[in-house]
Amino acid sequence: MSKSLQLIKEHDVKWIDLRFTDTKGKQQHVTMPARDVDDDFFEYGKMFDGSSIAGWKGIEASDMILMPDDSTAVLDPFTEEPTLIIVCDIIEPSTMQGYDRDPRAIARRAEEYLKSTGIGDTAFFGPEPEFFIFDEVKYKSDISGSMFKIFSEQAAWNTDADFEGGNKGHRPGVKGGYFPVPPVDHDHEIRTAMCNALEEMGLKVEVHHHEVATAGQNEIGVSFNTLVAKADEVQTLKYCVHNVADAYGKTVTFMPKPLYGDNGSGMHVHMSIAKDGKNTFAGEGYAGLSDTALYFIGGIIKHGKALNGFTNPSTNSYKRLVPGFEAPVMLAYSARNRSASIRIPYVNSPKARRIEARFPDPSANPYLAFAALLMAGLDGIQNKIHPGDAADKNLYDLPPEEAKEIPQVCGSLKEALEELDKGRAFLTKGGVFSDDFIDAYLELKSEEEIKVRTFVHPLEYDLYYSV
């Protein structure tokens, strides 16, 4: 009996929630009665209209198949009726193969490509998505004007505000949230509830804490996993965090830079490659790294700007990637140096040796970001791209003449998309990313970039209204 059918029977499940992720990284779903699930369901899947998903099919060829991945079946802890969540792959009906533009299919192809190279058989990923918990957010963007307003009782700007029950103080200042105990940490209980929900859904929580920024910046660390499974788990984490916050009457955002003047939210990504059960990144070189790991780093540095198109895919991403807010803008590597975009964390055992890319952020589609990072690293290994000397000094304090010698991440989404367009060759190896998908992705993200660039900004009224 399949895992899904067993859970349906054991928990008297009434509904099946089929999940998939669109190009922009947002999880989508459709729900069907559990009584319709049988063995044929896992062979033939469920038809749906793909024309309504941005960046996918036109209306003239819209039929697509949601093919359930039985291994992902898990009970939904947030529904009143017993509901089973199953993550799906998108299948092209004419070929019964994975749809070329399905992010999960791309991630699967990246895993298969790794095996085909002989470099390794398993890629491990450990992302750390940060997020803000707010009490309320209001925003508007239309022809009459635009605005946003954040309401957060624990925000540094509310030291003199009036609240029902009084203002008790005890709030983290700007860049002061890492990491005092309660009552300064207002979010301990809600984070614990989020962790309980994550554990219910099969994720292994390792740590949770308040992050650096005021107004409720937080992080929940969960254990690493293989590429596709970890991308699935990122989507599960976002689902849990959003829904627990909603149950508490709060609201969460994973956008990279919701606050001006304080730290943004990153998604540092830890990575390693194993072959025959051995960590290929462990060696006798710098910081205990092997040549394989150094070449992997070289590939990420070489393709860093093109990677930004997937790892930092929003206009808001580049408001985080600026000096002065603990966001790494220099494409350099170092042991334990958090100002470098690639860090080699200290570990107790060679089995845990890994690298950490610090420039990605949680607006990224995890399937695309992880696949792209792997492809960049593999290109570095295949071409023996050495990253040069490590940068063991504080890169934030470099004099201008030294800083200009170190490559930097992109400064805007427009630049990132241009770099992705011209530097795509490493991504299309082995048919992992197709030119068709990259073209469609560039078109989709360019629409966002143009809209933001041409929209009238409230700050422009401050600067120019009285000219």
From Swiss-Prot:
Binds 2 Mg(2+) ions per subunit. Pfam families: Gln-synt_C, Gln-synt_N. Keywords: ATP-binding, Cytoplasm, Ligase, Magnesium, Metal-binding, Nitrogen fixation, Nucleotide-binding, Phosphoprotein. It catalyses: L-glutamate + NH4(+) + ATP = L-glutamine + ADP + phosphate + H(+). Mg(2+) 1 binds at E128, H268, E356. ATP binds at E206, H270, M271, S272, R338, R343, K351. It is found in: Cytoplasm. Its cofactor is Mg(2+). L-glutamate binds at N263, G264, R320, E326, R338, R358. Catalyzes the ATP-dependent biosynthesis of glutamine from glutamate and ammonia. This is Glutamine synthetase. It comes from Azotobacter vinelandii.
